[in-house]
């Protein structure tokens, strides 16, 4: 199990690296059904996003020093708002089951 303090550090690193609108923890850690195989699943929502895949790789690299199993997905604010109500999408899952760990004021 990944300690809460490490999750907090991950959020702080993502905030500094991405200047996000919102960071959502979703998946098993958000649902509370954590197993030994569980990783952290973060959705980082940015105001605008030009190169989604490159940004996912970049943010994953930012978290590498924490040495934890993690998946970082990114979406623009518009894409998130357009797809968050569409069942069967990761954005729907994150919107419904996720925990908002950071939201820009």
Pin down the residues of each PLM region:
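Catalytic core of pol beta-like nucleotidyltransferases
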Residues: 1-22, 31-36, 47-105
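Conserved H-loop
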Residues: 28
């Amino acid at each position: 199990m990944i300690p809460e303090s490490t999750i907090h550090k991950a959020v702080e690193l993502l905030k500094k690296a991405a200047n996000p609108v919102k960071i959502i923890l979703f998946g098993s850690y958000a649902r509370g059904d954590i197993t030994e195989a569980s990783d952290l699943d973060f959705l980082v929502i940015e105001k605008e996003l030009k190169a989604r895949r490159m940004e996912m790789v970049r943010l994953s690299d930012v978290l590498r020093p924490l040495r934890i199993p993690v998946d970082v997905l990114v979406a623009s604010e518009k894409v998130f708002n357009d797809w968050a109500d569409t069942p069967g999408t990761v954005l729907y899952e994150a919107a419904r089951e996720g925990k908002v760990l950071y939201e820009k004021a």
